UniProtKB/Swiss-Prot annotation:
Chief subcellular location: nucleus
A GO cellular-component term linked to this record: perinuclear region of cytoplasm
Protein name: Caveolin-2
Purpose of the protein: May act as a scaffolding protein within caveolar membranes. Interacts directly with G-protein alpha subunits and can functionally regulate their activity. Acts as an accessory protein in conjunction with CAV1 in targeting to lipid rafts and driving caveolae formation. The Ser-36 phosphorylated form has a role in modulating mitosis in endothelial cells. Positive regulator of cellular mitogenesis of the MAPK signaling pathway. Required for the insulin-stimulated nuclear translocation and activation of MAPK1 and STAT3, and the subsequent regulation of cell cycle progression.
Swiss-Prot/TrEMBL keywords: Cell membrane, Cytoplasm, Golgi apparatus, Membrane, Nucleus, Phosphoprotein
Membrane topology value: Peripheral membrane protein
Biological processes, Gene Ontology terms: caveola assembly; endoplasmic reticulum organization; insulin receptor signaling pathway; mitochondrion organization; negative regulation of endothelial cell proliferation; positive regulation of dopamine receptor signaling pathway; regulation of cytosolic calcium ion concentration; skeletal muscle fiber development
Intramembrane annotation, residue ranges: 87-107
Cellular compartments annotated: Nucleus; Cytoplasm; Golgi apparatus membrane; Cell membrane
Length: 162
């Protein structure tokens, strides 16, 4: 990794048709210049938390405070929201992420190894249980209900007003 003393010979060939005399900034995608950081909420799970000062504090037209008070309270609101969020995430984000990971791992394990095998077993057994239940219903419960229904169908009530 020493000092290079040789000259590099570089040439660039461009067609006149493909060469644009514009800088290209006016044609660029504006989203590339907004924020190059990753989107931490791609599914918009917390879109309801995007609250501004005007969403929380609102003065009607008839009652306005002094402009300096409004500006200072707006600045204090934004700064305190920013600082408190950073402070809370420093102390709570890692432990809560750890606990959430344990919780979701436990729930996943229970779902995969206990709940789904139980459900699949029940679904495998249910056709035979259904056949047995239908036989019991046809042999015992249906005749019993039929005889009770016939007994009560012969009962008649007569009301008289005396």
């Amino acid at each position: 990794m020493g000092l290079e003393t040789e000259k590099a010979d570089v040439q660039l060939f461009m067609d006149d048709d493909s060469y644009s005399h514009h800088s290209g900034l006016e044609y660029a995608d504006p989203e590339k210049f907004v924020d190059s950081g990753q989107d931490r909420d791609p599914h918009r799970l917390n879109s309801h938390l995007k609250l501004g000062f005007e969403d929380v504090i609102a003065e009607p037209v008839t009652t306005h405070s002094f402009d300096k008070v409004w500006i200072c309270s707006h600045a204090l609101f934004e700064i305190s929201k920013y600082v408190m969020y950073k402070f809370l995430t420093v102390f709570l984000a890692i432990p809560l992420a750890f606990l959430a990971g344990i919780l979701f791992a436990t729930l996943s394990c229970l779902h995969i190894w206990i709940i789904m095998p139980f459900v699949k077993t029940c679904l495998m057994v249910l056709p035979s249980v259904q056949t047995i239940w239908k036989s019991v219903t046809d042999a015992i419960i249906a005749p019993l209900c039929t005889s009770i229904g016939r007994s009560f169908s012969s009962v008649s009530l007569q009301l008289s007003q005396d």
